[in-house]
Amino acid sequence: MTKKYVVALDQGTTSSRAIIFDHDANIVSVSQREFTQIYPQAGWVEHDPMEIWASQSSTLIEVIARSGIHASEIASIGITNQRETTVIWDKQTGKPVYNAIVWQCRRSSEICEELKSQGLEAYIRDTTGLLLDPYFSGTKIKWILDNVSGVRERAERGELLFGTIDTWLVWKLTEGKVHVTDPTNASRTLLFNIHTQSWDKRILEALTIPESLLPQVKPSSAVYGKTRIAGEGGEISIAGIAGDQQSALFGQLCTEPGMAKNTYGTGCFLLMNTGEKAVKSNHGLLTTIAIGAKGEVNYALEGSVFMGGATIQWLRDELGLIRDAQDTEYFASRVESTNGVYLVPAFVGLGAPYWDPSARGALVGLTRGSNRNHIIRAALEAIAYQSRDLLDAMAKDSGVELKKLKVDGGAVANDFLMQFQADITSVEVQRPAVTETTAMGAAFLAGLAVGFWDSTSELKHRADIDKSFMPSISEEQKDELYAGWQKAVSQTING
């Protein structure tokens, strides 16, 4: 049969999805399943790797069955994933030795402090482009090796494998035949030299991590292996891998230096492509690996906010202020302002540009007149304020004053948030017609690897803009609002 489709597996922090795209990059079918969030104690976040696999494999089977497409019509599968989340498993049985430690988890803070005391902070920053923070995989691996009975001994005997979620899924899809990752995911481990594009022996020694645990690093657009899980029709090539944020950057076709996007998901992630130059940040951002127009390694500046959409989940699940995330736009629009209320959602510390794991959330400026609408509006505004923090830092590091910001992720459907983002940054915010840019990036990579598409120039017609949001408030208003935010943040950092 003719190859007519590409499948993207989008393994996120709260759900696993499978999306089928046709040759025009239109969405044909979608399947999604949520999975359990595990919070063993304050600041700890885990997932069950087997539940992730069950949810992801079932969506793949379901999306093909639901669409009526024959597996033989699928050219390839691309994978995009929550980054940094850490899985270690037995290479013979395939059984994880512990739950996956999620990117949000802060349990390895003491390990980070220990590395700082050894004087390794500058070396790690220069080599990996990352900060010494519990966010990244390296210290999570060490925590498992040091704290789960018998695991270090098994690792040193070569019995175990490590992977971020992309690696885990490829290993499962290929029935244990393939242990790989790509440069975008490798660059988030704290173990990868982004300049030589290889695992760094000095950091591995400092963390006492056996190199035998680590996957082979292959290009983001390449055939890694085949899977038989998708039903009748033979094997399907697995041909694209990218961490979720780099995948979104590629899906938005930000393949040239100076192009940037912000993804509004569980967290918020602002990335700017810097081309072949790895720009070192002096303002709390990360230097990471991105993907160029031909699938080659590019570099990017990245700012990460831990609590984006997760802040809205908190309003719903813990406070009961809303029934659905979509309700926030209605409630926020019922008041002219927050009336001085600011929410700083530092529930698991603060990410870029502050990097303070000890910061805790705060709701400030409350008066007797403060109500549900003010708090909900403050939660939405907090997402935009945190993104403004990143944008300011990026401009200082890169020397580029952004005029346009491409956006994607679930929260971009919220017109109130998008307009406030434009207002508080004085930047035009562009929402694409197809907002599934993270999955689309994985599909593009997988399709390009097998010749389903010839080049990214063939894909540029998919970059249509649904709506542009232009700044609409005065500089004075903007500065006053942002000063209030900065004051609120300072209270969470300084106690």
From Swiss-Prot:
Binding-site positions, ATP: 13-15, 266, 309, 313, 410
EC number(s) given by UniProt: 2.7.1.30
Mechanisms controlling activity: Inhibited by fructose 1,6-bisphosphate (FBP).
InterPro entries for the chain: ATPase_NBD, Carb_kinase_FGGY, Carb_kinase_FGGY_CS, FGGY_C, FGGY_N, Glycerol_kin
Keyword terms, alphabetized: ATP-binding, Glycerol metabolism, Kinase, Nucleotide-binding, Transferase
SUPFAM superfamilies assigned: Actin-like ATPase domain (SSF53067)
Alphabetical list of Pfam families matching this protein: FGGY_C (PF02782), FGGY_N (PF00370)
GO terms, molecular function: ATP binding; glycerol kinase activity
Source organism superkingdom: Bacteria
Keyword Nucleotide-binding among record annotations: yes
GO biological process, alphabetically ordered: glycerol catabolic process; glycerol metabolic process; glycerol-3-phosphate metabolic process
Catalytic activity: glycerol + ATP = sn-glycerol 3-phosphate + ADP + H(+)
Binding-site list for ADP: 13, 17, 266, 309, 410, 414
Enzyme class: transferase
Entry GO terms, CC: cytosol
Family membership: Belongs to the FGGY kinase family.
Protein's job: Key enzyme in the regulation of glycerol uptake and metabolism. Catalyzes the phosphorylation of glycerol to yield sn-glycerol 3-phosphate.
The protein's name: Glycerol kinase
Native source organism of the sequence: Shewanella woodyi (strain ATCC 51908 / MS32)
Lineage: Bacteria, Pseudomonadati, Pseudomonadota, Gammaproteobacteria, Alteromonadales
